[in-house]
């Protein structure tokens, strides 16, 4: 399988970012483990996959996979890299975008300085 990807770094975490908008990517636990392996694959802390939105009020859906292939709910450093990837690759011309994750919605903003601002939903402390 051949895929286009970017290797990105955010405050010490490294990511393989995959555009699932313009190419088909069949994700499996074994594929994630291979990509993340530092000797046999590309090597990364997490694999990030950008997908089409699942709701009309969202710009993109964002999936986060740990090195062991498990899918997780959130990664703030990864969200910053996703915003930069979306902007740099022309996937959106917007400065502010909304993305959904496994269980959350984030607002991302590309600042004039090139930095990325990530706005999380307020935490819920009740069980």
Residue spans for each PLM region:
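A glycine-rich beta-to-alpha transition motif near the start of alpha/beta enzyme domains, typified by
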Residues: 1-112
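Catalytic phosphate-donor-binding core of small-molecule kinases
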Residues: 103-127
